[in-house]
Amino acid sequence: MIAKHVPMRSIKKSDFAELVKYITDEQGKTERLGHVRVTNCEANTLPAVMAEVMATQHGNTRSEADKTYHLLVSFRAGEKPDAETLRAIEDRICAGLGFAEHQRVSAVHHDTDNLHIHIAINKIHPTRNTIHEPYRAYRALADLCATLERDYGLERDNHETRQRVSENRANDMERHAGVESLVGWIKRECLPELQAAQSWEDLHRVLRENGLKLRERGNGFIFEAGDGTTVKASTVSRDLSKPKLEARFGAFTPAEGGEAPRRREYRAKPLKTRIDTTELYARYQSERQEMGAVRKGELDTLRRRRDRLIEAAMRSNRLRRAAIKLLGEGRIAKRLMYAQAHKALRADLDKINREYRQGRQAVQERTQRRAWADWLKAEAMKGDDKALAALRAREGRSDLKGNTIQGSGEAKPGHAAVTDNITKKGTIIYRVGSSAVRDDGDRLQVSREATTDGLDAALRLAMERFGDRITVNGTAEFKERIAQAAAAGRLAITFDDAALERRRQELLTKEQAHEQPERNDGRRDRGGDGGIRPAAARTTLNATGGDGDRRDARAVSAGGTVALRKPNVGRIGRKPPPQSQNRLRALSQLGVVRIAGGAEMLLPRDVPGHVEQQGAEPAHALRRGVSGPGRGLKPEQIAAAEKYVAEREQKRLNGFDIPKHARYTDYVGALSYAGTRNVEDQALALLRKENDEILVLPVDKATVQRMKRLAIGDPVTVTPRGSLKTTRGRSR
């Protein structure tokens, strides 16, 4: 776990509202924005919260410092603390920095390899209007992180605070941009030689051989590379600071003599990895130069257009003033007309400048120069396999952990339908409904709200990538859900885990037995080799199409037995329900146009008033019995539940501190009573899961009256019939 302050280089550019917009922007990605939380604010929507905080900041007119504090809390790859833990960590860190009573907005992000929280804090106290600047925040954050890791069982990180700001920035450059910094290059290439120098002459010689120069700057020394990049000597090593060097060699002596032959020199280029990125980096530099030329040309065009429009507006204003001067009106009338002309000119100039600023911003965003890692990410999103391999070869990349799926065979390239994002470490995030599947090249992971569709998509992707032999790692609950998804999807896979494979086969057998067709007399038909064939299989079904062709509606199975193409049908000869008559099931053609006689003509009086809203008649011969909660719900009950869930989810996305809501389906686990609601005269019961998610279950009014005896937080369970039951054993 790492917590760090992200300072603004320019105080004038600091803006609380813009920071909140950035951290709460989904950017068109499903797997980016998680829970958004607002603390110590009276407003209920994000725009109102931003206005409230900005008003508080404007109340302090004395301070000229940055009034916004941007805090970033990041967790190790694979760590997924629950919502309650994240809230507790945020509260304790903010309190440790002295911001417990300050206004703040936080957002959880899932679009990288590391779960992280952005926290935008107002440094102005909401009631005292005083500014608070944490003293030695880096030390306080290091101590807080160490304590929180111990209290919540998180993986330990190195919280050494001896690194300087410049060294941290160099590390960030290498980690995020993927480009070698001057500090890192000197440490890797020539630091031992510099430390072994015995005099100023030896030191200058080593520097010249490596394309560096030693210069005095202020009270210390700097190293300067051939491209003008500089770094403090003490940042590279404390042994190279000015006091240490003068204590060893005496007073500083500048370099003398001409240029010496260089063995190597620093150039900003990608960090060395296990694959060669020379061609990719050449493409990157070429596109970067082209983008710079395009940007310069478009900005020049916008600038010339703005100047022409301004000149035209000024010329029009001069003509207007000249016309006013020639008028024979009085002084007061002319003064009013001059004022109107000036006001019109100001409006025109403001419009021209506003359009110019908007156009310039659009050009800058479209032609923005990307860092090396960002360019690789963009190319990988376009389908460049070489760029994706370069991302996955970066140093510090870790494998996916937790609930994962992988294969024993060699990984083959494969892509799902929708790619939501690709991280800077080469992890592809595929969008699957409300969940997502992560792919690091070696294994797959279903992340965030692992739905049945997400598990099924992960298994199918694993089959495409690794073959039919799959290895599943994770919790027992995850393995059980994987086995259920494999059985429900009839996937032709085999699990390496013998127990899991037996469970899959058991579930598959139950699924097949459950779907075996039944006879009209209630007994199951038996079929297969050596058994009694069903009557439907012994009878030849012929259907006549529109052209008179006769088609056999039977199919021969691999074992030689006759199998119906249409499962779950009743006994042959039984008249199908009305909505199933004259359908095209298993028929090539069907004549549907005929001339009806006069006695069969449909007249207006024969058409019921609700003809456009007629529903399907029940066809119980083709249906299986429905069991479990939700059975027999009326359409208005379902509509009311869905309306309430949609309304609460929209408020949650708008920044309200509201837990996730969903309709109750077939959840099995601990639940607690969270109250009742009435929507469109329909009663809804609210049930809280262990992760604070609220499940909405429609109930009747009699059940609502009985539920009034319950208190908020009482444990309840949902019976298969859809009623509520407390731990005391009394049905509610």
UniProtKB/Swiss-Prot annotation:
A Pfam family recorded for this sequence: TraI_middle
Residue ranges, annotated region (Disordered): 508-553
InterPro entries: Endonuclease_MobA/VirD2, LPD7, TraI-like_C, TraI/MobA_relaxases, TraI_M
Job description of the protein: The initiation process of transfer DNA synthesis requires the interaction of at least three plasmid-specific components (TraH, I, and J) at the transfer origin resulting in the assembly of a specialised nucleoprotein complex - the relaxosome. Site- and strand-specific cleavage at the transfer origin is dependent on TraI and TraJ.
UniProt keywords, alphabetically: Conjugation, Plasmid
Superkingdom to which the source organism belongs: Bacteria
Disulfide bonds: none
Biased composition, class Basic and acidic residues, residue ranges: 508-528
Name under which the protein is recorded: Protein TraI
